[in-house]
């Protein structure tokens, strides 16, 4: 059974985009999120592009755009290894990864793979932060 979130994304396949907000998300995408979405759409012509800003779950200021999770579904991934798929995503986002983006979790799937499991994975809780918050000095 599909969750409401997955059902929304399946409906969104017709428009090739899926609106998603993480714990740091707001009603409108920030400039980094917008750039990531535009660059992946241009580079990969995805059938599904689901992007979640997960910065709010990390030790960063409110409203940050530093930690993202993306599910990108493209026929361009056919016949490629997971490493090759991730390299395509990294190539498209080289500016963001060299600057404002600290972490990017990637699910790069073919359309057939997405149909088998049409959902964006959930990240585990952040265990990072300053050394003082981890109990060391």
UniProtKB/Swiss-Prot annotation:
GO cellular component: iron-sulfur cluster assembly complex; mitochondrion
Primary localization: mitochondrion
InterPro entries in alphabetical order: BolA (IPR002634), BolA-like_sf (IPR036065), BolA/IbaG_stress_morph_reg (IPR050961)
Cystine bridges: none
Transmembrane segments: none
Pfam family, one: BolA
Positions of post-translational Phosphoserine modification: 81
Intracellular or extracellular location(s): Mitochondrion
Residue span of region Disordered: 115-137
Keywords, sorted A to Z: Mitochondrion, Phosphoprotein
Function: Acts as a mitochondrial iron-sulfur (Fe-S) cluster assembly factor that facilitates (Fe-S) cluster insertion into a subset of mitochondrial proteins. Probably acts together with the monothiol glutaredoxin GLRX5. May protect cells against oxidative stress.
PANTHER family noted in UniProt: BOLA TRANSCRIPTION REGULATOR, BOLA-LIKE PROTEIN 1
Assembly and interaction partners: Interacts with GLRX5.
Family according to the record: Belongs to the BolA/IbaG family.
Protein name (Swiss-Prot/TrEMBL): BolA-like protein 1
Gene transcribed to yield this protein: Bola1
